[in-house]
Amino acid sequence: MKELAGKTAFVTGAASGIGLGIATAFAQAGAKVMLCDIEEAALSAAVEQLRRTNADVDCVKADVSFKVELAAAAEATMARYGKVHILVNNAGVSGGGPYGTWTEASWNWTMGVNLMATIWGIELFGPLIEHHGEGGHIVSTASIAGLISGSSNAYNVSKYGVVALSEGLRRELAPRGIGVSVLCPGFIRTQIMNSRRNLPRRFAEAFRPMPTAGPLAEQVSMIRERVSQGIDPIYVGELVREGVEKDLPYIFTDLEFEPMIEARFAAIK
């Protein structure tokens, strides 16, 4: 999709972080953007921020781990803009933890937000994009952890799933005029390490207390520090805009993990 001006995009997890960076980049390129998030106050603030730049944006609150709420968001988007050209499955949470800390609830929440919401988004918005015959694009946010596993197993599995889904759909949807890209960010300055702020009540038992000392605690502390000093989400948004315009299969934010990715594929050979 070489021209975003006049097109309509739907972005989940858009109240902050990478989602807001993507929404900002799309709006600056002349696209109309429907922002979707579970955090209502932050969502409203993001919309007001963008409207001050004369962007054509609106918002809809949804817990994307509920398919019915995502479906309602799709209906709201069509009612507001009439068409959808770009779907960005960006909402995500950090959950799961290493072996020995798992709970059924933590797996259900992590997979529900990170993977199932992506699947449902494509199921709901794919036909809307295909219907108008003007072409479109789907971007799904995975992670470097979708290519090289870290210590949070449920997170790894969910992000590997997003990568696999995107790779398969790219081949399948190309003849229908729909491009597919997967975003694999590294350390980005977001609130991903504070995902529990949005933990639904039904998953209240999702997390066991984390150790306050030892290797695991040190690793979590390191990740928090890297995230706090991470790449600006606005820059990531620009990379995604470029990725859509150039129909890139993979969108990376930096080259830090390239040697580890190469080592993985060398081991596979």
Language-model regions: role of each:
Residues 2-34:
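Canonical Rossmann dinucleotide-binding motif of NAD(H)/NADP(H)-dependent dehydrogenases/reductases
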Residues 175-251:
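SDR active-site lid
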Residues 29, 128, 168-178:
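Active-site-adjacent segment of SDR/Rossmann-fold oxidoreductases
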Residues 122, 158:
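Active-site helix of classical SDR
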Residues 98-99, 106-108:
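Substrate-binding pocket helix/loop in short-chain dehydrogenase/reductase
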Residues 40-41, 61-72, 104:
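The beta1-alpha1 cofactor-binding region of Rossmann-like NAD(H)/NADP(H)-dependent oxidoreductases
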Residues 143:
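Residue(s) in the substrate-gating loop at a strand-loop-helix junction
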